[in-house]
Amino acid sequence: MSNYQFTKPAGPFRLFELAKISGATLYEGKGETFTVSGLAKLSEATSNDLVMLHQKKYVKELKHTAARVCIIGPDYVKYAPDSMYLLVHPNPYKAFALIAQAFYPSEKPPGFIATSAMIESSAIIGVDCFIAHGAYIGNQVKIGNRCKIGVNTYIGDTVTIGDDCLIEDNVSIRHAVIGNNVVIYSGARIGQDGFGFASDANGHYKIPHAGGVIIGNDVEIGANTCIDRGSLDNTVIEDWCRLDNLVQIGHNVKIGKGSVLVAQVGIAGSTELGEHVTLAGQVGVIGHLKIGKGATVLASAKVYKNVKSGDRVGGHPAVSISDWQKQIRFLKTAIKSKKSPKS
């Protein structure tokens, strides 16, 4: 069962309510009024917990779980015990996410401004905002309604933040325009100068940065992620993007709508990502490239050339998945035969 030490769930909910929330179908209409009190892993569930099955490798656990209710894909219904109530959805992980949001809704703290917060007189703060201790709000800043600004967070001059945003503790934001429903986790740094300089034999010469950072609506930015401001243009993160912890976004980078960047991704300056691009953990991308719509780059790959829309690439340097697999098979064969690859 869930650990309620830190977050107590809402509910309980009846199955017909969860079906409506998630868009799932109650299998054979059974169990409409059965009550679910929490969410749990298959191996830890009690009879009133809800579990999920979305991968075949967990079928054995499903057969032995104590849970009476499971969110499940259509292809896995045949593996469920006869006594189990099923919420069937073509994307059970999405259905689980929607139900989890119902059990654990986002907290909306009441309006509050700490006496230790420093807010410049020209700043405009919306209604029902929560400004925590030690926060600094600069000149001509505009913060929308129902926002939360965490402890010791710095919001620099002329920054604009939309409605319903959560800016956690120890964040710094400069030279940025941020949309609605944005979450920025602790330690993130947004809007500092990028890594730009000219060099000769006598040293390095800084290129001043005059651009900003534009972040769309419904974006999440992970802890200790850094997003540099543009040099002459802006750095842009479009709507619905998800950036994990410890991601580095260089100056002038453009990230298309709905893209997902996993932990420790690094993107050098002026590279552009299309919509719904996925960069897995530790992917590195050099500057001035274009990665097309819907492309996927597998973990730890290093990208040195453009990637076409819809392509899936991996390796170092990144190539198509089929070519990467051929390279790996060739290396294994060469090692086993103790022969060096031909030049």
UniProtKB/Swiss-Prot annotation:
<dbReference type="GO" id="GO:0016020">
    <property type="term" value="C:membrane"/>
</dbReference>
<comment type="subunit">
    <text>Homotrimer.</text>
</comment>
<keyword id="KW-0444">Lipid biosynthesis</keyword>
<dbReference type="GO" id="GO:0016410">
    <property type="term" value="F:N-acyltransferase activity"/>
</dbReference>
<dbReference type="Pfam" id="PF04613">
    <property type="entry name" value="LpxD"/>
</dbReference>
<keyword id="KW-0012">Acyltransferase</keyword>
<dbReference type="InterPro" id="IPR001451">
    <property type="entry name" value="Hexapep"/>
</dbReference>
<dbReference type="GO" id="GO:0009245">
    <property type="term" value="P:lipid A biosynthetic process"/>
</dbReference>
<protein>
    <recommendedName>
        <fullName>UDP-3-O-acylglucosamine N-acyltransferase 2</fullName>
        <ecNumber>2.3.1.191</ecNumber>
    </recommendedName>
</protein>
<keyword id="KW-0441">Lipid A biosynthesis</keyword>
<dbReference type="InterPro" id="IPR007691">
    <property type="entry name" value="LpxD"/>
</dbReference>
<dbReference type="InterPro" id="IPR020573">
    <property type="entry name" value="UDP_GlcNAc_AcTrfase_non-rep"/>
</dbReference>
<comment type="similarity">
    <text>Belongs to the transferase hexapeptide repeat family. LpxD subfamily.</text>
</comment>
<keyword id="KW-0443">Lipid metabolism</keyword>
<feature type="active site" description="Proton acceptor">
    <location>
        <position position="251"/>
    </location>
</feature>
<comment type="pathway">
    <text>Bacterial outer membrane biogenesis; LPS lipid A biosynthesis.</text>
</comment>
<keyword id="KW-0808">Transferase</keyword>
<dbReference type="Pfam" id="PF00132">
    <property type="entry name" value="Hexapep"/>
</dbReference>
<dbReference type="InterPro" id="IPR018357">
    <property type="entry name" value="Hexapep_transf_CS"/>
</dbReference>
<comment type="function">
    <text>Catalyzes the N-acylation of UDP-3-O-acylglucosamine using 3-hydroxyacyl-ACP as the acyl donor. Is involved in the biosynthesis of lipid A, a phosphorylated glycolipid that anchors the lipopolysaccharide to the outer membrane of the cell.</text>
</comment>
<dbReference type="InterPro" id="IPR011004">
    <property type="entry name" value="Trimer_LpxA-like_sf"/>
</dbReference>
<keyword id="KW-0677">Repeat</keyword>
